[in-house]
Amino acid sequence: MILALRDVRPFDAPEQWRHPLSLVVEENSFLVVRTVPVLGSRLFRLILGAERPASGSVSVLDKAPGDLPRQEVRALRSRIGSVLIPDGLVGNMTVWRNLALPLIFASGMDEDEVERRIERVVEAFGLDDIRTRRPANLPADARQIVALARAVVGSPSLLLLDDPLASVGTVETGRLIALCRHFAGTVIATTHRRNTVLYENADDVALWDESGYRDAGHAAGQVAS
């Protein structure tokens, strides 16, 4: 399995996190979780090792991120792509340079391989016309697409998406989901509103609120609006 949480609660848990969270995500699956922003962001912080759980256990790619030394946390994060809130793009760098950053920080990758990977996502995500522009000057939908491309440029084993498609149209959402699944092994996406396209493309859909975490199955209609 890629991810396993067992009876997890964070320190200073938000009001909505009333019950311990248990969750298992298998390899090459796509999970969508309908939740509120604070729960999604805290969950991803636990997965990325940015905070330790107050109780329970977190296993990510066979590692306990909250217990790892800093260098090993960085190594684990190099295998995880993410689009969080805010998106973390560097506004005064070009799109091309933003795409290069996660590869530059990855050890052992030569310049030719960096360029090959960047060109691959530039072509797939349709970014050629904006590669020299800066994210600070892009509309919201284009910026979200750049953030997705940057998250998958390293072909991560796990991709974390925190409500990443809020500014993107329905047709484009379906295309971007397919690209994320192509470049990343396993995807976990949160959404803060009803998103039928996400639900329809997911292997599993869940609802998580103050009542707890519960599976909603595969049918988009089972998730309340």
Give the label of every model feature segment.
Residues 65-81:
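ABC ATPase NBD coupling module
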Residues 113-130:
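Conserved ABC ATPase "signature" region
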Residues 86, 93-105:
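Q-loop/switch helix immediately C-terminal to the Walker
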Residues 48:
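Helix-to-loop junction immediately C-terminal to a conserved catalytic motif
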Residues 148:
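Hydrophobic anchor residue at the start of the ABC signature
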Residues 56-66:
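Conserved ABC transporter NBD signature motif
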Residues 134-142:
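Conserved ABC ATPase signature
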Residues 151-152:
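ABC ATPase C-loop
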